[in-house]
């Protein structure tokens, strides 16, 4: 019989893996337990399958429930209705989301959009952050363009002066959860050439603004995304987030927070896959014995367990890296964590499917759904080639 112990980060009351290495206070531990109970009581694969087949791809009641738990404002300032937490608190939420495979605009709203508005400050932050913390406002960030290949500074969308404001023209791609967003943060070029770092300005655009057209679709993991065309979209000067021409720094900081958050989500998903595969190997019989008694498969499960532990370390490292003041060191640590998470995620997903045999490929089994999500995480905010190049450049700059 397979003798590997249960994952050390399992809540014995409900079997939900969690990132206990992230916990620094008793409040964080209780928060994580509340999230685990919430998802265990309200969300599972059959429910998820129904939700992803309908619009908007998630249950608004679940969204309100998360807001009531304080998840939406966990990293937002207390002055604007948040909890004043940081990367570790966000990691706790994202770890629980990864374990449950909960699909929603949480990343785009609370982590990316809310973080950008908070960093930009001013009237926009005071006006919108309290509603985000209460779960009453959802955001999307249109950080990608068709030609950009993960380069945030590659912005062809233009923002030209138009009376008392600006006129936006351009295209954005794979804008996460734009279909359910109340407003979209749009980077546009107010000065400079297409790949210049200076000259990018962030605008908060109401999702129903005339000239903003969407083509909505589902991604392979059941999330929602849109390709957006901006045709003469008019916004006032009050829509500018932060400083004119200085939006790239806000966007890059948001992407790094997004990577750290996704690392925690991936670690939670991998923990679930390990537990599910371990339980299957202890019950599935072949040749008159449970397959967990076969030494070759035990060795593979040890590798999966080791990968899960390494993923937790990578997630913790990414959260810690957000506090690094040196840009080159921060870039190196964030990209290093992303490379590690992507590699480990592929390994754990592939092994979990293979160890389940043919049924591992079916839609009825949960492991395939987690594998798809890990695949999408691997492609978010830069793939392996992009982050290898970024890591190398940061090493040379050190």
Name each model feature, range by range.
Residues 112-120:
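Helix-loop "lid/cap" segments that line or gate small-molecule binding pockets
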